[in-house]
Amino acid sequence: PPLTSCGVQRSESLSAFLEAVPLDVVYSTDYKRTQSTAEPTARAQGLSIQSYSTQALEEMAEQLVRHGQDALVVGHSNTTGVLAGLLVGEEIGSFDESIYNRVYQVVISKNDKRLHVFHTAFDCAGR
């Protein structure tokens, strides 16, 4: 199904949140909702959305590390935490599918891997 009007507002808030972050690539699964969530950020940064499979998270993590790009990866409640964990070498599970305000930032440098979790205020107007 498409994003709700609230989901559209959140996707635009995500784009604004990342406005000052120059991204190299935007990844999303092939689901309509994740594509629609990624679209405002990709458009604002002049990027096309690259697809990835949730069935190959280890490969995705390896690709992200190998390419060393600043990337936005839009995923799902049962895969996003897992992918973040793979990137930093920690076991992180899924989160409740009703949570829409969580942004994981993974910072990988030569000697360190860090995970920051932002609990954003991506609330909907009129709620």
Regions found by a protein language model. Give the residues of each.
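Active-site metal-binding loops of divalent metal-dependent hydrolases
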Residues: 77
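Active-site-proximal alpha-helix that buttresses catalytic centers in soluble enzyme cores
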Residues: 1-68, 80-87, 91-127
